[in-house]
Regions:
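N-terminal helix-turn-helix DNA-binding module of bacterial transcription factors
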Residues: 1-54
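An N-terminal-biased, well-structured beta-alpha scaffold segment characteristic
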Residues: 59-151, 273
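Phosphate-binding beta-alpha-beta segment of Rossmann-like dinucleotide-binding domains, i.e.
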Residues: 146, 154-202, 217
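Rossmann-like dinucleotide-binding domain for NAD(H)/NADP(H)
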Residues: 146, 150-151, 283-347
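Short glycine-/small-residue-rich Rossmann-like dinucleotide-binding loops
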Residues: 22, 50, 111, 133, ...
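An anion/phosphate-binding loop that grips the pyrophosphate of nucleotide cofactors and donors
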Residues: 103, 122, 254-255, 283
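Rossmann-like dinucleotide/phosphate-binding beta-alpha-beta segment
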Residues: 191-282
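Short acidic active-site motifs
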Residues: 92-96, 113-117, 247-250, 272-275, ...
């Protein structure tokens, strides 16, 4: 049984399985234990990498391709560990295929896709590092099956992305972008842009990992009620967040704001569609600063056009950059160009 088959059988995304079995610190011990038990039950024997971060750093001949722009401060880390780097940005898949055999590692952000073809092309590749949280632009299944470590930086952008999600909540509640657009046209439409307070409102989090937890903490500081749908969240974590763990249906039904904080997997793609949106209150708002593809954008267009919910704010899209989308025609949506991790501190 390979990783993909095991993932489908137990209903847990491959990235979480891989990180749990490689004992990554961002995966809770409870989740690790659960996955280990399921692996034993289903006779799944992962091809775990024998590489360790220590052994990687000790190799003076270790060479890494930096395929997307990262902070200049990051280069000192490579230098201090005698790791050679090549900075080559905006490469096509074919261009990467032609050079990937020269590298032990590759560093990407969200633009570059590390595909199955790229991974299988090189027998030298040992590490794929994603400078950010999500790894949906990396074929984790193929990498894991070949014993290649897939790394990310789950804590690095958590606060930044959480703040952006909350900023979108504020913007919807107080209609700030719409009021700005009106005012620069020399209009003065105070009554049109009357908003709502966030205090005592309920925010429902669909997914509550590092970023979702930060959103929960900020929301509680605003005296909001927090509901959470996350099958993998422990009772201890829920208690520490002072949140209420609920089903997806209950979160959609009772929340004033629904905010998504999930990875994009075969199980989460289009998790929010027209059927789910119809369960939400007509006065509610939908926010996605996680991954494009979690929301069916055509269904969202229908819902907003027909006022099934009051509004939405999206920072991520199924296809980026966003071009020729039906969402552009709506006057009750806020769109930002994937700014979640775009702060000086996070970079």
């Amino acid at each position: 049984m390979n990783l993909k088959e095991f993932s489908k059988r137990i209903g847990i995304n491959p990235s979480t399985i891989s990180r749990a079995l490689n004992d990554y610190p961002d995966i809770s011990q409870k989740t690790k234990d659960t996955i280990l038990k399921l692996a034993k039950k289903h006779s799944y024997k992962p091809n775990l990498s024998a590489q360790s971060i220590g052994s990687i750093k000790s190799k003076t001949s270790f060479k890494v391709l930096i395929a997307d722009k990262i902070s200049d401060a990051s280069f000192k880390i490579f230098k201090d560990n005698n790791i050679l780097i090549d900075k080559k940005y905006n490469l096509t898949e074919d261009q990467i295929l032609s050079i990937i055999s020269n590298y032990d590692g590759i560093v990407v952000r969200s633009s570059t896709k590390v595909t199955k073809k790229i991974i299988e092309k090189s027998n030298r590749l040992k590490v794929i590092a994603r400078a950010g949280v999500g790894v949906d632009n990396v074929d984790v299944v193929t990498a894991t099956n070949r014993g290649i470590i897939v790394m990310n930086s789950p804590q690095s952008t958590s606060r930044t992305t959480a703040e952006h999600a909350i900023s979108l909540v504020f913007s919807l509640a107080r209609k700030i972008p719409f009021a700005h657009h009106s005012t620069i046209q020399k209009k003065w439409e105070k009554e049109l842009f009357k908003g709502i307070e966030l205090k005592s409102k309920t925010i429902g989090l669909v997914g509550c990992g590092n970023i979702g937890s930060e959103v929960a903490r900020i929301a509680k500081s605003l005296e909001m009620n927090v509901m959470v749908y996350d099958p993998f969240l422990s009772a201890e974590k829920i208690e520490s967040l002072d949140a209420e763990k609920s089903s997806l249906d209950e979160v959609l039904k009772h929340s004033d704001f629904v905010s998504l904080h999930l990875p994009l997997t075969i199980n989460t793609k289009n998790i929010i569609n027209l059927k789910q949106i119809k369960k939400m209150k007509k006065t509610s708002y939908l926010v996605n600063a996680a991954r494009g593809g979690l929301i069916n954008e055509n269904d969202l267009h229908i819902a907003l056009k027909n006022k099934l919910i009051t509004g939405a704010a999206l920072d991520v899209f199924e296809s980026e950059p966003l071009k020729n989308s039906l969402l552009h025609s709506l006057d009750n949506i806020i769109l930002t160009p994937h700014l979640g991790a775009s702060t000086t501190e996070a970079q």
